[in-house]
From Swiss-Prot:
<feature type="active site" description="Proton acceptor; for phosphorylation activity. Proton donor; for dephosphorylation activity">
    <location>
        <position position="178"/>
    </location>
</feature>
<keyword id="KW-0723">Serine/threonine-protein kinase</keyword>
<feature type="binding site">
    <location>
        <position position="202"/>
    </location>
    <ligand>
        <name>Mg(2+)</name>
    </ligand>
</feature>
<dbReference type="Pfam" id="PF02603">
    <property type="entry name" value="Hpr_kinase_N"/>
</dbReference>
<keyword id="KW-0547">Nucleotide-binding</keyword>
<dbReference type="GO" id="GO:0004712">
    <property type="term" value="F:protein serine/threonine/tyrosine kinase activity"/>
</dbReference>
<dbReference type="GO" id="GO:0006109">
    <property type="term" value="P:regulation of carbohydrate metabolic process"/>
</dbReference>
<feature type="binding site">
    <location>
        <begin position="154"/>
        <end position="161"/>
    </location>
    <ligand>
        <name>ATP</name>
    </ligand>
</feature>
<dbReference type="GO" id="GO:0004674">
    <property type="term" value="F:protein serine/threonine kinase activity"/>
</dbReference>
<keyword id="KW-0511">Multifunctional enzyme</keyword>
<keyword id="KW-0808">Transferase</keyword>
<keyword id="KW-0460">Magnesium</keyword>
<dbReference type="InterPro" id="IPR011126">
    <property type="entry name" value="Hpr_kin/Pase_Hpr_N"/>
</dbReference>
<dbReference type="InterPro" id="IPR027417">
    <property type="entry name" value="P-loop_NTPase"/>
</dbReference>
<keyword id="KW-0418">Kinase</keyword>
<dbReference type="Pfam" id="PF07475">
    <property type="entry name" value="Hpr_kinase_C"/>
</dbReference>
<dbReference type="GO" id="GO:0000155">
    <property type="term" value="F:phosphorelay sensor kinase activity"/>
</dbReference>
């Protein structure tokens, strides 16, 4: 079962999260992703142990502040006795004196942040969810081209890495080569390089190249959202594949249960693969924005035929 320790979480966000109490239990294990709003637990309506980090923000602070101190203590105890791995107090939780007094009994790690609840959701909660996400390893190259995460796939030796190197020379970003870790968050896909292979590429005839050293750190990126898959096809695969000449519709590919747009590009001598890949990304962006080149071509052709008929 996947898990994350409170200590690892604090180290990851040491610039915005501070441990203020319960340091003896900093190795507590987070077993459930997300951040838990704890209204029902505070009210004593739920009594199951909590596996995720509990969050106390503006709403909880206002609710507690309306109660006498002794009642505040009872309400806070309702939460702490469920032994959450940690409790994180947002910037809006202004006074934690009563909480810390009650926590002398329970010694739950109490974390204080200078972030609001919404900011925590985009940063800390996203990070926690990433640690629990199902990861699938795929063979290919992951790039960011014109701001779009592109997963480049194809048979071994077809020229994926060579095409990627051309794209890197055009200042597109490398996320990873060969072994790509893909994971799902909600209905979105993200990808990153395996830790060992990060920043490296294998080019046939040259061997292993350290892209970060050769081109600079600015040409690589930790991860990207995958929006597009492009498959490079050999001559044999091309003969067995079906192509729509006009390309009016976007094909879809299923990765980890998420459907993403998909292009197939046949490889042959005389074709500049990297430029075709760039064109595919531009076409994808145009279609996503509502413009379809094939449909415009069809409309122009139809208008021309109608003019000829009128004559």
């Amino acid at each position: 079962m996947k898990h994350l320790t409170v200590k690892a979480l604090v180290l990851q966000f040491n610039d915005c999260i501070q441990l203020i109490d319960g340091k003896n239990n900093i190795d507590n294990v987070i077993t459930i992703p997300g951040l838990k709003r704890s209204v029902f637990e505070l009210l004593g309506l739920f009594c199951k142990p909590i596996g995720s980090v509990a969050i106390l923000g503006k709403r909880e602070f206002i609710f507690l502040n309306q109660k006498p101190v002794e009642q505040q203590k009872k309400i806070i105890a309702n939460l702490l006795k469920l032994k959450p791995p940690a409790v994180i107090l947002t910037k809006s939780f202004l006074d934690c004196g009563v909480l810390l007094a009650v926590n002398q009994t329970y010694q739950v790690p109490i974390l204080k942040t200078n972030l609001f609840s919404t900011e925590l959701s985009f940063t800390v909660e996203t990070y926690i969810n990433e640690q629990f996400a199902t990861v699938q390893k795929l063979h290919g190259v992951l790039l960011e081209i014109f701001g779009v995460g592109v997963f480049l796939e194809g048979k071994s030796g077809i020229g994926k890495s060579e095409s990627a190197l051309d794209l890197i020379n055009k200042n597109h970003l490398l996320i990873g080569d060969d072994a790509i870790e893909i994971y799902r968050l909600g209905n979105r896909l993200f990808g990153r390089a395996q830790a060992l292979a990060k920043g490296f590429m294998e080019i046939r005839g040259l061997g292993i190249i350290n892209i970060e050293r050769a081109y600079g750190l600015q040409i690589t990126k930790e991860q990207t959202e995958i929006q597009l898959a492009i498959s490079l096809l050999s001559l044999e695969e091309k003969n067995n594949a079906s192509f729509e000449r006009l390309g009016s519709d976007l094909k879809l590919k299923n990765l980890l249960g998420v459907k993403i747009s998909y292009y197939q590009i046949p490889i042959s001598s005389g074709r500049k693969t990297s430029e075709i890949i760039e064109s595919a990304v531009i076409d994808f962006k145009l279609k996503k924005s509502g413009y379809n080149s094939a449909n415009e071509f069809i409309l122009k052709q139809r208008a021309m035929l109608e003019e000829q008929t009128d004559e």
